[in-house]
């Protein structure tokens, strides 16, 4: 792995951005907790509890968890880890076969909402360096009720539009490509169904212009920060039924199945000695398999 000053500067810049984005997202989510109508969401507004962790083999991170009244469970985490891939992992990572040392920094979040009419969401962006370096990440929306799981539902239209704007600023071919990649990635083969309505997913993003690739990854984060609170405000005032809560709990089971069977981030974290509590914090707080 290159240890030149230029790469160190890039690592520091990426880490600083992910930590800044974490702070902005946590503030926005706490604001939503404050705004949630008390008749639907009794109790005190939630606040994030942050907990630092260290990775014995190098690096660490900060978990941010909130169990609120509107956000039933949300985790917003940052981590910066480094070390040496196992031979098994090195074979699967670009540039690691020649030199197994790696560096990875990023942000990840998953929000599970109290109200079944407010969709769950997942977002992550990351920067990874071996003898090569690249960005990856994306965001995807998971409505829990059937009528919301249609591409012509307003929330789906607006969610896709937000990421299209972020992509089109750089290349009009990126959004169709990364949207299709998201649909392919967040799919449960054993159920033959998508996890949600999609979004974008990208990986190994290295155009040769690091500053431009970094700017794109920042805009992906900003797009999330703009659109998801908008969708939450749109739906959080709607009352829900016991039947809708039941549908929500059953649909959450698909989330668990995907994360444990297919999710790259989960597997990467567990295979590189990541923080297990942080990795599995994506699990919903309550779920049913009928």
Swiss-Prot record:
Its Gene Ontology cellular component terms are: cytoplasm
Enzyme class, spelled out: oxidoreductase
The cellular location(s) given in this protein's UniProt record come to: Cytoplasm
For this UniProt entry, which segments traverse the membrane?
A: none
Q: Name one GO biological process term.
A: protoporphyrinogen IX biosynthetic process
Please provide, alphabetically and separated by semicolons, the GO molecular function terms listed in this UniProt record: coproporphyrinogen oxidase activity; metal ion binding; protein homodimerization activity
| Pfam families associated with the record | Coprogen_oxidas
Pathway of action: Porphyrin-containing compound metabolism; protoporphyrin-IX biosynthesis; protoporphyrinogen-IX from coproporphyrinogen-III (O2 route): step 1/1
Q: Which cofactor does it need?
A: a divalent metal cation
Principal place of residence: cytoplasm
List the catalysed reactions.
Answer: coproporphyrinogen III + O2 + 2 H(+) = protoporphyrinogen IX + 2 CO2 + 2 H2O
The UniProt entry annotates the active site at: 122
UniProt keyword Membrane, yes or no: no
Where on this chain does a divalent metal cation bind? 112, 122, 160, 190
Question: Site described as Important for dimerization, positions?
Answer: 190
Task: State the InterPro entries in the record.
Answer: Coprogen_oxidase_aer, Coprogen_oxidase_aer_sf, Coprogen_oxidase_CS
Region span, Important for dimerization: 255-290
Q: Gene3D superfamilies of this UniProt entry?
A: Coproporphyrinogen III oxidase, aerobic
EC assignment: the record states: 1.3.3.3
Residues binding substrate are 108, 124-126, 273-275
For this UniProt record, the keywords arranged alphabetically read as follows: Cytoplasm, Heme biosynthesis, Metal-binding, Oxidoreductase, Porphyrin biosynthesis
Report the family membership. Belongs to the aerobic coproporphyrinogen-III oxidase family.
Quaternary context: Homodimer.
User: What task does this protein carry out?
Assistant: Involved in the heme biosynthesis. Catalyzes the aerobic oxidative decarboxylation of propionate groups of rings A and B of coproporphyrinogen-III to yield the vinyl groups in protoporphyrinogen-IX.
User: Would you tell me the protein name for this molecule?
Assistant: Oxygen-dependent coproporphyrinogen-III oxidase
**Annotated source species:** Caulobacter vibrioides (strain NA1000 / CB15N)
**What taxonomic lineage is listed for the species of origin?**
Bacteria, Pseudomonadati, Pseudomonadota, Alphaproteobacteria, Caulobacterales
Gene name, per UniProt, is: hemF
């Amino acid at each position: 792995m290159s240890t030149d000053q230029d790469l160190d500067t890039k690592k520091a810049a990426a880490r600083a951005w992910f930590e800044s984005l974490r702070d902005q997202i946590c503030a926005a989510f706490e604001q939503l907790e404050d705004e949630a109508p008390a008749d639907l969401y009794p109790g005190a507004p939630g606040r994030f509890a942050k907990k630092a962790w260290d990775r014995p083999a190098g690096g660490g991170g900060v978990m941010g968890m909130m169990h609120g009244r509107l956000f039933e469970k949300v985790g917003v985490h940052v981590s910066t880890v480094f070390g040496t891939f196992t031979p098994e992992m090195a074979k699967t990572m670009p540039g690691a076969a020649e030199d197994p040392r790696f560096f990875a920094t990023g942000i990840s979040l998953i929000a599970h909402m109290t109200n079944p009419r407010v969709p769950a969401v997942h977002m992550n962006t990351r920067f990874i360096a071996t003898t090569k370096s690249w960005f990856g990440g994306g965001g995807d929306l998971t409505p829990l009720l059937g009528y919301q799981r249609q591409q012509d539902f307003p929330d789906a239209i607006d969610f896709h539009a937000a990421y299209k704007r972020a992509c089109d600023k750089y290349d009009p071919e990126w959004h169709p490509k990364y949207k299709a990649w998201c649909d392919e990635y967040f799919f449960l083969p054993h159920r033959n169904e998508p996890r949600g309505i999609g979004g974008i997913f990208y990986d190994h993003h290295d155009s040769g212009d690091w500053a431009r690739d970094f700017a794109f990854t920042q805009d992906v984060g900003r797009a999330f920060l703009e659109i998801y609170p908008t969708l939450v405000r749109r739906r959080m005032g709607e009352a829900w039924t016991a039947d809708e809560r039941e549908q929500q709990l059953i649909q959450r089971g698909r989330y668990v199945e995907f994360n444990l069977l297919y999710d790259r981030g989960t597997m990467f974290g567990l295979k590189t000695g990541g923080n297990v509590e942080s990795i599995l914090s994506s699990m919903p707080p309550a779920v049913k398999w009928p």
